[in-house]
Design a protein with these regions (language model features):
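Glycine-/small-residue-enriched capping loops at alpha/beta junctions
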Residues: 1-103
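Phosphate/ribose-phosphate-bearing ligand recognition and processing surfaces
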Residues: 79-177
Length: 177
């Protein structure tokens, strides 16, 4: 996994991942940023053709004017209650988003830190979940480049620190590049 401090909407990868609501309409956070940067009308039409997404699953639309080829919409829900089930649900969102990109023959995917803002997943937990799922996916899909894109320096530094610590616990599996 590669860490990127920047704007996911500018990533020139095969796909970018969006943290989406089940109605696939623009919502706050990264979702709103993606809709604003894309041709909003075209993206809303593409999402409208799909209709709804199931929580924990992912659906794909064209990029609608962004540098990437596809937008993978990972459908989440609020973390308010927390617990193991919520953690598994968020892990499924990452897993299904990466799997969807793989099924579309994507060789590079930009993934944001999903659900830690408006969906209320605590940021350190969100970082660990993202790191665990991305590392596991890389083991079984070594040809795919996965970029964890973080929009703010403090979150970027937190992610590097937390995932470097879990890296040491994984006995040196290299994923922080």
């Amino acid at each position: 996994m590669y860490f990127v401090l920047g704007d996911i909407t500018k990533m020139d990868t095969d796909a970018i991942v969006n943290a989406a609501a089940s109605d696939l309409k623009p919502c706050d956070g990264i979702c709103r940023a993606i809709f604003r940067a894309a041709d909003t009308k075209k993206l809303m039409e593409a999402c409208g053709k799909i209709g709804r997404g199931r929580i924990g699953e992912a659906v794909i639309t064209p990029s609608c004017g962004l540098p990437c080829k596809y937008i993978v919409h990972a459908v989440g829900a609020g973390w308010y209650a927390g617990g193991r089930q919520a953690d598994l649900l968020f892990a499924d969102c990452y897993r299904h988003a990466l799997q969807a990109a793989f099924l579309y023959h994507c060789k590079s995917v930009a993934v944001p830190l999903m659900f830690s803002g408006d969906f209320h997943l605590p940021r350190p937990k969100a970082i660990r979940i993202a790191g665990d799922v991305i590392r596991a996916f890389e083991k079984t899909h070594p040809g795919m480049e996965i970029f964890l894109v973080l929009y703010n320096k403090s979150i970027y530094e937190m992610a590097v620190k937390i995932l470097a610590q879990t890296e040491e616990n994984d006995h040196g599996h290299e994923s922080v590049r």
